[in-house]
Structure formats: C-alpha cells, structure tokens
Amino acid sequence: MNTKETIKGKVTAVVGQIAELRFEGAEPELYWIFTTPDRSVLLQVFQSVEPKVYRCMVLKGRDVLCRGMEVTSNEERLKVKVGKNLLGRVVDIFGMPVDGGSEIVADQATEVLGDSPHYKKVRSEKKVWETGIKVIDFFSPLVWGGRIGLLGGAGVGKTVLLAEILHNVVTTHDGHSDNNRRRVSVFAGVGERVREGHDLYYELKEREVLKDVALVFGPMGENAAVRFLTAMAGVAMAERFRDWHGMDVLFLIDNVYRFAQAGSEMSTLTRTIPSEDGYQPTIGSEMANFHERIASTDRGSISSIEAIYVPSDDLLDYGVQSIYPYLDSIIALSRDVYQEGRFPSIDLLGSSSSMMTPTVIGEKHYEAITKARSVLKLSENLERMVALIGESELSPENKALYHRSKIIKNYMSQPFFVVEDQTGRPGVYVSLADTVDDVLNIVNGKFDNIPPEEFLFVGSVKNKVPAPVEATHEQITTQAVPVN
C-alpha cells in the first residue's frame, strides 16, 4: 500500500501574505498545503524561488506565523467539503460554516484546483433555461450548460440582477426533477462586500428557497489567495453535484473580475513581471482553467451566470477582455439606462447571445427578436433628430417607429422580488412565451395608441395594459438587423 511521505519545511521569511520555506530533504510540488500540528497555520506552495526555497501563500494564521516555525505536508492539495449537506449553508474555502450554524459534516472532500472534464465527455444541451426576467430570456437567454456574463460598472445593478435570477430559478426550478435530475444552485461570492452576501442569505432564507442553494464566500476583506481560491472552490462544489449526484447545477459567481484581480495581486506579491494592463501573465490560463470546468456531461450539467465588474466602465480593460471568449451570452448593464430610471438597466442592443438561432430558441422567438432589434436600431438614428426638432416633427412612419422603440425599452423594465421592500412594487415573473407574444404585438403596432409610460415596471402586457385598439399609423416595414 502506498503511503504518503511527510514533507517538512522551515519558515525563513514572512512578508505580508507571503512566507518563504526552506527544505533540507525532499521538495514539495506546487499547490501542496503545509500546516502546523494544530492547523492554526495553512500555507499553499505557489512558486519556486531557488533550489530548496519556495514561496507560499498564507491562507490562514498570518498573525501567528513566524520565522523558524516548522510546517509539514502530507503531499495533499487544498480540499473543500462537498455534498448535499452543503445545501442551505454558507461556508468558506476551508469548509467552515460562516452562517452561525453548526459544523458541517460532509460526506466527501474534493480538491479545489481540479481538472476540466475530458472533451469526449462534454455534452452540449441546446435548451433554454427560463429565468422569468423578460430582458434576459428575450435578448440573451441562458442555455443549459452555457455561460452568461453580466457586465457593468460600479452601482448599475449587477448584484441585484444576479440575486433575482437566483431567486427566480430556485423558486421555479430547484428541488424539482427534470429528466430524472434534480436542480440545485451554487453561489460563489468572490471579493465583494460582506453586506451583499448577508442580504442575499437572509433574502433566500426568508423566501424559503435556501435549502436548494450552497453558498461559498471569500469577501473583499480576505487576502488575495483566499479570494482567488473561492471561485475555484465554488466550481468544485458544482462539479460534485454534477458528477456524483447527477444534478443540473446553476452556478452563480459575483464577481469574476475580482477573481482576475486577486490573481493579479498574487502575481504582484510574488514579484512576477506583469503583462498587458498590469495583469498577471497567467491570466489567460487561469480563466481557461476556471471556465472549462463549467461544462455539461452525461451525468449532469453546470450552467453559469457570472457578474463581471467593468473598471471605470472600460469594456476594453484586459481583465474584462480575458473573460469574453468563454461566454455564450453577454448582458451589458448601462449607466445611461440606469440614469433614465429603467431597471434592470440593460443595454438592449449591447446585449447578445451566440445561441440566438431558430434551432435553439424557436422560429417565433427568433422572428420577434429580429423585429425588435430592427426597431431599436432604426430608432437610434431618430434620437438626434428628436433632440433637435422634437418628436412631433417626425413623419408618421418615423413617429410610430420611435414610439414603438420607447414601448419596447419600457416594457423590458420589471419589478424584482428581491427588492420589493425597497421599491414598494411586488415582484413579477414573466414566462418567455408571454414575453415573445407581447414583443410581437408591440412591433406590429397593436399598442401604438398607448403612452410608453404605461409599460414601465409591468409584467405581461395582457395583464397590465388596457386592451389595445387597431393601430392608427401605417404598418412599418423595417429591414431586419442581424442578431449577433
């Protein structure tokens, strides 16, 4: 029987979050974990400096770490607790509860830094996963096994939108079987505020949907290594639900940019020469390792929704650009839309999906989105004219077109369940079928006699808007704008 050798090292230097270890005998491999006998200190091997000398990230116990301290390793990497006992609980990357509850007894533990599934085992399910949020389901639908990114600067509503998606999916789908599979959700909070995690936890608990969600947090107060590994730990939990329990998993992460930022901080701490825009030279491989683990197999699926902070609203930032290649759909949150008071503040034309094909979303949905994007695109050209001479000076055809574009924009606003106590408006869930029917009615001119303001923060039009009369404007034929 193979027994793992105990590797011993001695701390020779401690600089902030970095500890240097010297070894007299056998040397460690990258990412091995070293601890003290009482496990008050936890170090992860990160970099080889010279023969027998290695730099380690201090994951735990920086206050008690000192020069001359001996640490040992059993040739193991960092593991996180996984399994059904994590559902309804909040943990850190060490599997310790941070929700004030009892200790978690997990049936298994798995390595945080795992490998992606073999490409022969990866399966692609071309099926839309409904969220009940009109603008997402219509313009950038989530597909089983797909990845969708919520891009936006500070304070435009990424976290609220992510929380609403989680609430709707859990309420509507989780805990119910589909093709003999149970659906669960995993939420990874990476580098964000503790308050946001606190609010999310109690919102889910209050609505009695926490039992189908596992949460792992590494808030901004933690060091860079812990924040970086929290994202990987979340994926490891999702993989276990997929591979061992045969579940369909919705994986949500807030925020992927903080994951990239944590990697950059780690690179700086280890004195690695940066690459473009000051980011770590390994950012490409780190993003690949993270995203390629989010996949579907014969056993189950992982679908991800990723909040992505855009620093200074610069979409060309290299940290943001490094995420793009792995996304199937992009939802762009706009500060201009936010200032206009339409929530969720999503740029309708700036959002896109590679899944927008008739074979995936259906002929009717494809027709509706093609017409809607055409109306929105053509109305952009009229906005400058309206700003100069006013809407009343437009031709009847252009006036009807501009009117319909405003209706579409207002219709895509929606009251959310997770902020009911703040807005005073009850949340609304709208099915995709209703959304498609409503948009077709709008672009076909059936609501031309109704003011656009009537469409703000409503659910389905058939329930909230008075019965339409025949349009008074001529039918407008618009040239279709290709859907990205």
Regions found by a protein language model. Give the residues of each.
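Loop/turn-to-beta-strand initiation segments
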Residues: 182-185, 211-214, 246-250, 299-305
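Conserved glycine(s) of the Walker
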Residues: 157
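Phosphate-binding/switch loop-helix module in NTP-utilizing enzymes
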Residues: 225-263
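Nucleotide-state-sensitive switch-loop elements of NTP-binding domains
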Residues: 176-179, 183, 192-240, 268-284
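The Walker A (P-loop) glycine that initiates the GxxxxGKT/S ATP-binding motif of P-loop NTPases
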Residues: 152-153
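N-terminal accessory targeting/assembly segments
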Residues: 1-89, 94-98, 473-479, 484
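P-loop NTPase nucleotide-binding/switch module
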Residues: 69-71, 85, 98-146, 160-164, ...
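Conserved catalytic/coupling modules of large nucleotide/cofactor-utilizing molecular machines
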Residues: 64, 240, 258, 265-484
